[in-house]
From Swiss-Prot:
It holds the Pfam family tRNA-synt_2d. It comes from Wolbachia sp. subsp. Drosophila simulans (strain wRi). The gene is pheS. This is Phenylalanine--tRNA ligase alpha subunit. InterPro entries: aa-tRNA-synth_II, aa-tRNA-synth_II/BPL/LPL, Phe-tRNA-synth_IIc_asu, Phe-tRNA_ligase_II_N, Phe_tRNA_ligase_alpha1_bac, Phenylalanyl-tRNA_Synthase, tRNA-bd_arm. SUPFAM superfamilies: Class II aaRS and biotin synthetases, tRNA-binding arm. It is found in: Cytoplasm. Its EC number is 6.1.1.20. Mg(2+) binds at residue 265.
Length: 347
């Protein structure tokens, strides 16, 4: 039996070596490995058969022969595996090669949001007219949002259904999310008494309203010009120049309508002719009310000025034919791909 086992081992070696050499893929090689070196393989079966041999010397000799064969097959399989892996890599390199002469795929880049584009453009137009852009806090006290702007306590704009009021942990003074950036004008006039004062204040404003033409948060840019002998004619020239530049139409039809704002007197709303068939309101303006000057410590008998407020979303909707105000804030990539601008458009 021992002689038969030894003959089986020697014949097995030739067969195993042949199968290893003829394996054409890593999958075939793995099958060969399992059949000879696996837990249920032939080599394991030979070791199990050694238990039946009582002669310790013969058992040891046969065990050494089986060990030598196992190590040899293990090394042959490892070498063959390296060869097959190298062949696989070479095959992929030849068949999946990249043609470096082909143009690269364009990278996906972001776009400038229409509101950012409009804010930048509006600031630039007014900068050319000598207006400096200034910022102010979004959370304000009632004085800077209402009282200083000659807005009495009974005015509808101060009602809770129109304005977001905040709790003030420091004192009993109510705070609000500003309903316009006119509060920046008040802060500017409080801080500086060097004339002329010529500023625009872009920023977010908040009102308790939400539909196709209103959102709880939107953007305004408000302007202020204070000096001696400022008049309505200068205001009209400023507005005409801005609208003509922004819409790129020197023949744009513009009209001023009498209106009322508590912080200006006289006051006007400005419309433009839209598609030649109707008038669309684009901004409000007027001469600064004397009470506003008194509230910030400016002599209204010596100085006067004009102010205006422009809705950024309204300008963007008109210029870029956007029908729903809410789409500005939906965060849809497809929408931004369509309406967005390349960064080079920012001047």
């Amino acid at each position: 039996m021992n002689k038969e086992l030894l003959d089986d081992i020697l014949s097995l070696e030739d067969k195993a070596v042949s199968e290893i050499e003829n394996a054409s893929s890593l999958q075939d090689l793995e099958k060969v490995r399992l059949s000879y070196l696996g837990k249920k393989g032939v080599i394991k079966a030979y070791f199990d058969n050694l238990k039946e041999i009582e002669d310790a010397g013969k058992k040891r000799n046969l065990g050494e022969v089986i060990n030598v064969l196992r190590n040899k097959l293990d090394q042959l399989i490892m070498n063959k595996e390296n060869i097959l892996k190298a062949e696989e890599v070479n095959f992929k390199l030849q068949n999946e090669a990249v043609d470096i002469t082909l143009p690269a795929r364009p990278e996906k880049i972001g776009k400038v949001h229409p509101l950012s584009k409009v804010i930048n453009e509006v600031k630039l137009i007014f900068a050319h007219m000598g207006f400096k852009a200034v910022d102010g806090p979004d959370i304000e006290d009632e004085f800077h949002v209402f009282d200083a702007l000659n807005t009495p306590s009974h005015h509808p704009a101060r009602e809770e259904q129109d304005t977001f009021y905040l709790k003030n942990k420091r004192n009993d003074k109510r705070m609000v999310l500003r309903t316009h950036t006119s509060s920046v004008q008040i802060r500017t006039m409080e801080k500086t008494k060097k004339f002329p004062i010529k500023i625009v204040a872009p920023g977010r404003v908040y009102r308790n309203d939400f539909d196709a033409t209103h959102t709880p948060m939107f953007h305004q840019i408000e302007g202020l010009y204070v000096d001696e002998n400022v008049n309505m004619g200068q205001l009209k020239f400023t507005i005409h120049h801005f609208l003509n530049k922004f819409f790129g139409d020197k023949g744009l039809k513009i009209r001023f309508r009498n209106s009322f704002f508590p912080f200006t007197e006289p006051s006007a709303e400005v419309d433009i002719s839209y598609k030649g068939s109707k008038w669309i309101e684009v901004l409000g303006c007027g001469m600064v009310h004397p009470n506003v000057f008194q509230n910030v410590g400016i002599d209204h008998t010596k100085y006067n000025g004009f102010a205006f407020g422009i809705g950024i979303e309204r300008l963007a909707m008109l210029k870029y034919q956007i029908s729903d105000l809410r789409s500005f804030y939906d965060n849809k990539i497809s929408w931004l791909d369509h309406y967005g601008f390349h960064f080079s458009s920012l001047r």
